[in-house]
Design a protein with these regions (language model features):
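Alpha-helical support elements that line or immediately flank enzyme active sites
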Residues: 3-16, 70
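Non-catalytic C-terminal accessory modules of carbohydrate-active enzymes
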Residues: 17-152
């Protein structure tokens, strides 16, 4: 669990390079061919003294959450897209679709290789939100859509 937890903590702290490092380590050392988290360093890479192979899935969910926090973060009614993108992802196409946030939005993000970003927000319920990337406040009724476009 440690490496997936560290990836999540680094993503929350907006440190994309470190989040990517821990996700890569988790994938390379603690993930089996079938994608399951193997609790020990069964590949014997030297990062754990435990080398057994019992598997669990909880750390996989942590890793997935770390990736989501690299792409979208919320705090109250505010949100930010691509807050923890590692340097290795810059200048590359990137997209995520219909992420449902805990503040009542369904968000899709598309970034092209020239760093042009398109953000689509659909309200799950009526409310007022702050899009931190552009420091813009907006209101929507349930089902309404707001689109933002900018260069990162």
């Amino acid at each position: 669990f440690s490496y997936a937890w560290m990836a999540l903590l680094q993503a929350i702290c907006r440190n994309g390079d470190k989040a990517e490092y821990y996700l890569t380590l988790f994938q390379d050392v603690f993930t089996g061919p079938n994608g399951f988290h193997l609790n020990g360093d069964f590949k014997q890479k030297g990062v754990s003294r435990y080398t057994y192979r019992p598997f669990t899935l909880e750390a996989n969910f942590l890793a997935a959450e770390a990736i989501q926090h690299m792409l979208i973060q919320t705090e109250g009614m505010a949100f930010e897209v691509l807050p923890a993108v590692p340097a290795s992802w810059k200048g590359k196409r990137l997209s995520c679709f219909d992420f449902r946030t805990d503040n009542g939005l369904q968000i899709s993000v598309m970034r092209d290789d020239c760093n042009h970003v398109l953000v689509r927000c659909q309200a799950i319920y009526a409310g007022e939100w702050v899009f931190r990337n552009l420091n813009q406040t907006f209101s929507l009724n349930a089902g309404q859509v707001k689109t933002f476009s900018y260069c990162a």
